[in-house]
A protein has these predicted regions:
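Generic structural signal for residues in well-ordered beta-strands
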Residues: 43, 59, 187-188
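Di-metal (Zn2+ and/or Mg2+/Mn2+) metal-binding site signature of metallo-dependent hydrolases
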Residues: 1-19
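Helix-loop-beta element that forms the nucleotide-linked donor phosphate-binding surface
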Residues: 35-47
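Cap/insert and terminal regions of metallo-dependent hydrolase folds
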Residues: 12, 24-26, 30-33, 91, ...
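Short, surface-exposed connector motifs at secondary-structure boundaries
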Residues: 13-22, 86-92
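Alpha-helix capping/helix-boundary segments
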Residues: 5, 31-32, 50
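Histidine-centered active-site/metal-ligand motif
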Residues: 2-7, 66-68, 94, 134, ...
Length: 201
């Protein structure tokens, strides 16, 4: 989704590439060199709204509100975004990191509503500093509504301590937001490590 170290771990990608030499890597415009410098081939860069089709899977790179950098001199020299995955069976949206914006309304208008959406819910405190680039759980719920996703799964919480909120706070605030809006608990869920969500059509 973007080149921040907690989202683009080059050592993990090198291992994936070695175990799967035919793997194709889709990255935002400007990030290909990060992979090719480490010997990873089959890398394609994408601008917003560009897509690729592999077998029966169509992947479209979508705009979100965030930023990029891996060092001091490369801020916003590459893109950031979400990915919209389409198959004949279902559509899934992965938001990457994002602040709240109208990008999600545009994504729904251009690509349709996803059955599933993976939306970040953590790393938002203090909000005066983080809100532009990281949604809080209430804004994450609004993204799910903007996308008209049938079901959403909260991500980007409980793994790395990046900001000031308690590790357990994002799911609690999400449940409060669902209750406040009169939405069922299973409309937008969170999973603990080892949990899974069965995806069926």
């Amino acid at each position: 989704s973007h080149n921040h170290y907690d989202h683009l771990d080059i050592n993990s990608l090198v291992k994936i590439s070695k175990k799967n030499p035919d793997a194709q890597f889709l990255v935002p415009q400007g990030d290909k060199k990060i992979l090719t410098k480490r010997g990873i081939e089959n890398v394609s860069e994408f601008l917003w709204w560009e897509n690729s089709i592999v077998k029966n899977l169509k992947m479209t790179f979508t705009p979100v509100q965030h930023w990029s950098a891996r060092g001091l001199g490369d801020r916003n020299k590459s893109l950031w975004g979400g990915w919209f995955f389409e198959t004949t069976e279902l559509n899934l949206f992965h938001a990457g990191d994002t602040g709240y914006s109208n990008d999600f309304i545009m994504t729904k208008e251009k690509l349709g509503a996803p059955e599933y959406a993976l939306i970040p819910i953590g790393a938002y405190s203090p909000e005066w500093f983080m809100a532009e680039n990281h949604v809080n759980p209430e804004d994450a719920l609004q993204i799910a509504i903007d996308l008209d996703a049938k079901k959403s799964i909260g991500m980007h919480w409980g793994t790395f301590i990046l900001t000031d909120e308690a590790v357990t706070e994002p799911p609690q605030l999400l449940q409060s937001a669902l209750k406040e809006r009169g939405l069922p608990k299973d409309y937008f869920v969170t999973l603990k490590p080892g949990d899974y969500e069965l995806i069926n059509n």
